[in-house]
Amino acid sequence: MSDLEYKIRPMTLDDYDEVYALWMQIHGFGIRSIDDSKEGVERFLKRNPTTSMVAVSEGKIVGAILCGHDGRRGCLYHVCVHENYRKHGIGKSMAVACMRALQEEKINKVCLIAFKSNELGNHFWKEAGWDFREDLNYYDFTLNEANICLLYTSPSPRDLSTS
C-alpha cells in the first residue's frame, strides 16, 4: 500500500465515457458492443443502482467494477484498475464496497468470470480468498434471432433418445 489518495463511490451513468476509456486501456479486456454500450450500461445501472463502483484519484476514474445481482446471486463484471494505479489497494477497496452493497440488498454469494489468460486478475482473486470452481462448465448464449431459431429447431434430448 502507499499514500495514494483515492475515493470509492457508486458508479453513475455520467461516469460512462471515462469508464469506457479506462476499459479500452486494459490489455485483453473483453468488451461487447451491445452490453457495454452506453445504453447497455444504463440498463445495468438502472437495475443495479447502488452496487457498481468507481475509484477516483486526482479527479479521474482509475478503477471500475460493474456489479449487479438477480435477486439471488451477485456478479462482478469488468473489474479493472488503471495500470499506473495498481498495487495501492484500489481493486480490493472497490471489491469490498461492492460486497457491502450486495449485503445491503441481502445477497450472500457472488461470482465473477476471469479470462484464463488474465494471470494478474486470477492471482488477485485467489489471494483475496475466492474459490476457483473446477466442478462447473461455463456456457454462453448470444440472444439473436439465428441462435434462438437454432435452439428451437434443434432436437431435444428426449428426441435424441428415441432415434
Language model regions located:
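Acetyl-CoA-dependent GNAT
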Residues: P10-H78, A101, R133-E134
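Conserved acetyl-CoA-binding loop-helix of GNAT-fold acetyltransferases
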Residues: K87-R100
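A short, internal acetyl-CoA/4′-phosphopantetheine-binding micro-motif in the GNAT/acyltransferase core
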Residues: V79-R86, A114-F115
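Conserved N-terminal entry element of GNAT/NAT acetyltransferase domains
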Residues: M1-D14, A146-S154
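Conserved active-site alpha-helix within GNAT-family acetyltransferase domains
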Residues: K92-S93, K116-D135
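Single conserved hydrophobic/aromatic residue that forms the stacking wall/gate
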Residues: Y152-S163
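Conserved GNAT acetyl-CoA-binding A-motif
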Residues: Q103-A114
